[in-house]
């Protein structure tokens, strides 16, 4: 854990400054490490930061991106106004480019009272997404309290209010991208009004956010205990408090009244309305009340034990980020799915069936019941549980829990109401619902989900089975990558692996994976490229039996006959954007894995207002090997059986009725 003492940071020259002119309250911190000479870092930084303002709006208030060693993010406070957020991020970006020019790392928390906005812009030459960053600290204390104030009482009331605000801010609101945010307004005994705002970057876990904010409160109490307001900022979290309502964050928020002063002790406390207090009356009132209370407590305890036994238990083995894995009781799942009734069945996959369920709370769930002998063994089951409980991204399906009682192996996911992508893109009656903007958003979302898996999560994961049927669509048609049963976890210093058991869906698998069992992040990039071309054409890859969609699209590209690639439903849409996406798709399906782009580059190219140059694609992969033919027998590091090649044509997919 990083230390929070400001004076133990030898590598940083802290330039935390406060401007409070015309209602602008801004704190920025620059590092003292300069760029290495003759590098493109400054050019990439100057190209990346100006793009944050528009992209943070498109991403609903939080945006992170990287470009050739520059890692940046932008964040606005919850309930922001679009133009105010855009201006705030743009101003913060320009401030960092001018005030921290030449520095490898900096961050800037900015707020503007008149515009009702606050925001963060942060950049670094080190990958920090999803990681708690406590240093360097920016501390901006305000004016001192009135010396006649009761500082001890103020400190106690402040600590109590701050602790409650920390709990609110660090409790994740999964309905919002800006999930870590809290404000409070209270009247203290000796202070008419105290307003607090706390926020964390959404890439943190709830426990990391809580720790970061508590460190801010502790630091504030140690250094600013005699002030009427101030700001303590860190790269991962922000705490500001003041004696007035700032940045529009407290509109329609009721102020908590001051605690009542303790009444003076009266010597005649046993006398009321001229009558002597009768001790025996206590027995008359308290005895039956005590019996009723004891019965009530016993009932509550019995109910809680029964509920815990029948419904759920929390797995004691929490994952590394402190989030416990929810282990569902089989009885609860049977109740939720009406004992796996046919009416609740949503679909059938290669590894089992998927059912819709409803928890006692009313929450809808999707229950994947793995079939015996399906091929998804105990290791694969644990693999998916361990991976998904440690992954949190809006473009990944959320695992709610699991059950492994007796012979049952069950995974419980969030219910995603709009089925999977293949139910729309390959259905003539539904494909028109996928407008160009919806398709673009789906493609971007899948790309961001893959980038998170490959680079931005605490793990490095290769999905290995990306395809249209493994992309689920929520109520607003936002994509969520699903099905991690075949995913492989890499160490951070690993880039590729080999296997003798090639699993996946033929047509989406990269040629080096099909032929040699070699897989890497570029294998997922290939699958993404196939899916992207399917989104443009509205055709399944397998419809091009003799050569495959990538090869077909490549031929039409070099012949200049792009009309035969494009879905007729897209004829009235921006041709330059469609061609750009075809180009990106062809780059992703190139025969040579080394020439395929990273998902980081794909995200950069997908920016609609970007000015980046996209390379020209080379020849796409021609994977025409039929399923009945096995590739050449080659030496592989994981060879355990004689058959070097086995294909699961249909892998487990969360399907929903059409």
UniProtKB/Swiss-Prot annotation:
The modification Phosphothreonine is found at residue 505. It is a single-pass membrane protein. One of its GO terms (molecular function) is protein serine/threonine kinase activity. The modification Phosphotyrosine is found at residues 413, 513. Coiled coil: none annotated. GO terms for biological process: response to abscisic acid. InterPro entries: GNK2 (IPR002902), GNK2_sf (IPR038408), Kinase-like_dom_sf (IPR011009), Prot_kinase_dom (IPR000719), Protein_kinase_ATP_BS (IPR017441), Ser-Thr/Tyr_kinase_cat_dom (IPR001245), Ser/Thr_kinase_AS (IPR008271). Belongs to the protein kinase superfamily. Ser/Thr protein kinase family. CRK subfamily. This is Cysteine-rich receptor-like protein kinase 36.
């Amino acid at each position: 854990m990083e230390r929070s003492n400001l004076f133990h940071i030898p590598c940083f020259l802290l330039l935390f400054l406060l401007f409070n002119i015309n209602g602008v309250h801004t704190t920025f911190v620059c590092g003292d490490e300069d760029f290495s000479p003759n590098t493109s870092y400054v050019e990439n930084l100057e190209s990346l930061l100006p793009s944050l303002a528009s992209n943070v709006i498109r991403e609903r208030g939080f945006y992170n991106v990287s470009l050739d060693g520059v890692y940046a993010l932008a964040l606005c406070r919850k309930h922001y106004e679009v133009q105010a957020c855009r201006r705030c991020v743009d101003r913060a970006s320009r401030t960092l480019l001018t005030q921290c020019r030449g520095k490898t790392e900096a961050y800037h928390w900015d707020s503007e009272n008149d515009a009702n906005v606050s925001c963060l812009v942060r950049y670094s030459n080190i990958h920090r997404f999803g990681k708690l960053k406590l240093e360097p600290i920016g501390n901006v204390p305000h004016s001192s309290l009135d010396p006649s104030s009761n500082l001890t009482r103020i400190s106690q009331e402040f600590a109590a209010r701050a602790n409650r605000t920390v709990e609110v801010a660090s409790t994740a609101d999964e309905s919002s991208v800006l999930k870590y945010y809290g404000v409070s307004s209270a009247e203290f005994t000796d202070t008419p009004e105290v307003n607090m705002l706390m926020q964390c970057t959404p890439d943190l876990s709830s426990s990391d956010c809580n720790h970061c904010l508590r460190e801010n409160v502790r630091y504030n109490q140690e250094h600013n205990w005699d002030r009427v307001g101030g700001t303590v900022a860190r790269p991962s979290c922000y705490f500001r408090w003041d004696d007035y309502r700032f940045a529009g964050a407290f509109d329609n928020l009721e102020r908590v009244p001051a605690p009542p002063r303790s009444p003076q002790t009266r010597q005649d406390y046993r006398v009321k309305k001229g009558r002597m207090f009768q001790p025996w009356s206590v027995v008359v009132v308290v005895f039956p009340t005590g019996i009723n209370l004891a019965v009530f407590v016993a009932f509550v305890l019995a109910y809680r034990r029964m509920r815990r036994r029948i419904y759920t238990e929390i797995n004691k083995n929490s994952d590394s980020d402190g989030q416990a894995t929810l282990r569902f009781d089989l009885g609860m799942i049977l109740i939720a799915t009406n004992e796996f009734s046919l009416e609740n069945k949503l679909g059938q996959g290669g590894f089992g069936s998927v059912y819709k369920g409803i928890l006692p709370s009313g929450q809808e769930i999707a229950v994947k019941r793995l079939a015996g002998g399906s091929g998804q063994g105990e290791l694969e089951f644990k693999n998916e549980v361990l991976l998904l409980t440690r992954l949190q991204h809006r473009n990944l399906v959320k695992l709610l829990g699991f059950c492994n009682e007796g012979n049952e192996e069950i995974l419980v996911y969030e219910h995603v109401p709009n089925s999977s992508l293949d139910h729309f893109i390959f259905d003539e009656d539904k494909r028109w619902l996928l407008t160009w903007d919806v398709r673009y958003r789906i493609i971007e979302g899948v790309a961001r989900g893959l980038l998170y898996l490959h680079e931005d999560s605490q793990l490095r994961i290769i999905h290995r089975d990306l395809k249209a049927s493994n992309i689920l669509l929520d109520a607003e048609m936002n994509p969520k990558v699903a099905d991690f049963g075949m995913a492989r976890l890499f160490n951070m210093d690993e880039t590729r692996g080999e296997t003798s058991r090639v699993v996946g869906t033929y047509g989406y698998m990269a040629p080096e994976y099909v032929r040699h069992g070699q897989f890497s992040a570029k294998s997922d990039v290939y699958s993404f490229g196939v899916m992207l071309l399917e989104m443009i054409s509205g055709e399944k890859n397998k419809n091009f039996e003799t050569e495959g969609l990538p090869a077909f699209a490549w031929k039409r590209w070099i012949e200049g006959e792009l009309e035969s690639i494009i879905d007729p439903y897209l004829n009235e849409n921006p041709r330059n954007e469609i061609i750009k996406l075809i180009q990106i798709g062809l780059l992703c399906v190139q025969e040579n894995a080394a020439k395929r782009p990273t998902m980081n580059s794909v995200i950069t190219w997908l920016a609609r207002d970007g000015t980046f140059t996209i390379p020209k694609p080379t020849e796409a992969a021609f994977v025409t090997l039929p399923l009945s033919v096995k590739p050449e027998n080659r030496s592989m590091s994981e060879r355990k059986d004689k058959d070097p090649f086995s294909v699961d044509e249909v892998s487990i997919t969360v399907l929903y009725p059409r």
